[in-house]
Amino acid sequence: MHTYKSGCIFNTLSDIKDRHIVVMGLGLNGGGEACVRFFLKHGAYVLATDMKTAEQLKPTIDRLASDPELNTSKLTYRLGEHCIEDFKNADCVIKNPGVKIEGNKYLSAAKNIETDISIFLHFTKAPVIAVTGSKGKSSTVSAIHYGLNSAGYTAFLGGNITVSPLTFLEKTTEKTPVVLELSSWQLADLRGRGSLKPKISIITKIVPDHQNWYHAMEPYVADKQYG
């Protein structure tokens, strides 16, 4: 199991300005796109890299290109391949949770590795409700989020439920609860950082899952227990 060093490369949001960031995994589901938007907004130079081609990623690329609020002069792409020099030269690599760090030559070359979840947890002051498990995560976080908003709170919902918490980081305060659905992979990417300190932790039913990745229940359960 990989353990990350504690803390975050960025002490403040202003530290992001003019840093060179590699977003590994632009994708089509919004997570990589949210990372690109966040780091461009804070003045970083961003290289988005993905094994998918520009044609395959056209919807995401078009959304970024057509947003007048983004300074896309600081955005470059490397698509259809990864280049190890990009990872060596970056100040920080933003890792997709679906990429294994063990045995990955690109991530091994990186000076610093973060995720959207690790960045969010480092900077938010919001109380966090963290939910993991094999079955029932999404319905559980959705119910909690609905209940909090119905009770008069301004609550946010993100994580594995396909909403990156970076999209609402700067709207959070000590009074805005955040409900995070966290997969085993997202939890593994937090090991050693010391940033996950939820007010409430919930683990739903655990059953064999993702065994093509873990090859045994013990490491899978160990990642879930981290939550």
Tell where the protein language model's regions lie, with residue ranges.
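Phosphate-binding loop of NTP-binding sites
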Residues: 85-90, 97, 101-227
